[in-house]
């Protein structure tokens, strides 16, 4: 009882002090977004999300009794679910910090009736040299200053991180053109795969957040940076063996490292990024992990991550009429130890994926009309359990996508 009274007293005291620090100056509410319609033609069926808006790679062929690929089926879509609406609130000050909030939704929710999906929801505190962000935003490995300029809503998948998660992110200006960025991230609907399917439970039960550190240089023409990312998951909290059921605390700790570059000059822009990642399938990238060893008496497992390289380059030229080109390549490097299986993750039987994609976009004030073609090839094969889970006997399968988009921005 005494502890509750002390806590209540401290909260009341803090609240009264905060009212003295928090001031209102020119409260503003700004709206933004766009109305967008997309027509899409695919030469075959694909692994995708958001009702075909987010294309990853073509399905592995499945052959019927006549030897025909069931998934070699052209299909077309006319969609408007990528339309977006955002609201920014500003005008508060907390001491020397300006305070703002942002919330954004689109209509790609998990529903056949265009359900609303929350994209961003965060509060920012901005001091002269430091910014602190609380809430749901792009994962720090996304790199908001350097991501592909493509018409396709997949924003460079499956070569570029696509992940919005709850986080605490600090950005500090070390010098005029140099920032240090640190983040602590928890998974939500962008989550790892595992024995119970895709769920954030694995990371949350490991308790420690996904930790991130990054250095970013920038000036009028250049942005360049490098980052490291660490994560721990607990795939199981109990196992069953011949001697019964036992609690387990066996975790899988993994790393990712990346470097990126952007150059802008007049109407020309060039971007590139390369990332080495272990078990980063929560970011909608091919990857995962496998069981490395098993104690039959207790059911205790150890795990080994899949290692991948993800690379992309992108350039655009123009203003009213803009031509662009994107190319991406990823490679499955296998597991860190020889696996015994099973594998958990995304596309664990794919050896490599590449994509080439030109685009042409016309913009006039708030109006945009664009065309984009993409050629995506994935190499499916067999997992070699004697050679670190690498893929053998791989065969290529390709999808050709044509896309037309019309949008009005506000």
Q: Residue locations for each model-derived region?
A:
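Detector for outer-membrane/organellar transmembrane beta-barrel domains
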Residues: 219-350, 354
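C-terminal beta-signal and adjacent terminal beta-strands/loops
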Residues: 366, 374-389
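Bacterial Sec-dependent N-terminal signal peptides
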Residues: 1-20
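Outer membrane beta-barrel
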Residues: 20-53, 61-190, 207, 212-223, ...
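Outer-membrane beta-barrel proteins
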Residues: 42-46, 112-114, 143-147, 189-194, ...
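Short sequence motifs at beta-strands and strand-loop junctions characteristic
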Residues: 25, 72-80, 113-115, 160-162, ...
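Outer-membrane beta-barrel "beta-signal"
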Residues: 394-410
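Extracellular loop and loop/strand-boundary signature of outer-membrane beta-barrel proteins
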Residues: 70-73, 108, 151-156, 192-201, ...
